Amino acid sequence: MQGRFISSGLKQGSLIEYPKKISGVLLVLFLSIPVSAGAHAFPDHSDPRVGSTQKIPPANVRIWFDGPIEPLFSTLEVFDSSGQKVDKGDSQVDPGDHTILEVGLPTLPPGTYTVSWSVIAIDTHHTEGRFKFSIEGKS
């Protein structure tokens, strides 16, 4: 039999090296398993709609997300064109549907408003964004 002997007196390629080969194969298989990207929560639609012009001031802003969001870590704010916060400060996730985030508004005058949202999805991934809507002035 040909083969090189190692210090233990066993030939290379014997049972001693078998666990190393199996470990290597298992590591390659484990690393090749696809991993889910997670359930980041992104807006699906909103009311008022992104970029819309409203004839009547909305009573609130609602955003529907494509997945559930964490109530304790999700906020929604509305700002006027000078950067002043104008919402009622009652931002909340809908208790009956954790994909909806809403905030109340006072009667707003004509102008352009920026909606700013920040949410944590159930998988703990953070997303945030902004959009604008306008309220028509009297002609």
What is each of the regions a protein language model found here?
Residues G24-P34:
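Bacterial N-terminal signal peptides
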Residues V61-R62, G67-G89:
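Short, surface-exposed alpha-helix to beta-strand junction/turn motifs within ectodomains of secreted
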Residues Q54-I56, N60-G67, T124-S139:
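Extended, polar beta-sheet/loop recognition surfaces of beta-rich domains
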Residues G96-E102:
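Aromatic sugar-binding surface patches on proteins
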Residues G38-P57:
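N-terminal edge beta-strand
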Residues G89-Q92, V103-L105:
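Beta-strand-rich interaction surfaces with strong enrichment in secreted/lumenal proteins
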Residues G3-G24:
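Bacterial N-terminal signal peptides that target proteins for export
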